[in-house]
Amino acid sequence: MSTGKVALEVKELHAFYGKSHILQGVNLHVNEGEIVALLGRNGAGRSTTVKAIMGMVDNRGEVLWRGKNVLGMKAYEVAHLGIGYVPESRDIFPKLTVHQNLMLGQKSAKKLGRWSFDDMYKMFPRLRERQHIEAGVLSGGEQQMLTLCRTLMGDPDLIMIDEPTEGLAPAIVQLVAEYLMELKRRGICVVLVEQKLAIALQISDRVYVMGDRRIVFEGTPAELKADANIRKEWLEV
């Protein structure tokens, strides 16, 4: 449950790819225990925003994680502070088994986190069935499950997930939504980069809409549903 206490605050975030000015002053925040959706069309800057927060692209501004400015840190340093990132590319180690991939996600073999291997396999029984299979032969949906689970094994306090439902069957999409709600129940903040409006509005506490590489709307799912002009201008194809 959201406490109203700010966990992540982004102030005037700019990002650059070479000489290209991609993000132009993004401002957003995530409260403790909240699911926040970042919506927008392709090219709006959503993926670049989470990459800039992680320190994966050239940036300037402020990124405050529980009051500490992490801008300028390397991605692995940001991760060690408790921010997890699940890219759209479904990065796995294809020649390692499912279980070995999960083992690589552990922060420390000696430290017990919120999540165990059994937790992962209970949420995604298909991974249990295939735990000794090389990850490279998994379906796209199974690889998405594995990427999410491996990130969780690092015990993050906030997880940023880029297009987790892309290309997945409807039944798997709903499974991912339930999974994200379980993260919230366990006290983990979620930043969800998503194009499927229905799923984002179903599970999010608040939403941001991006357009022209900046934030053009902030509000609750109900407020976005009621604002036909914003949806038409910035979301509908």
Regions found by a protein language model. Give the residues of each.
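Glycine-rich phosphate-binding loops of nucleotide-dependent enzymes
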Residues: 2-237
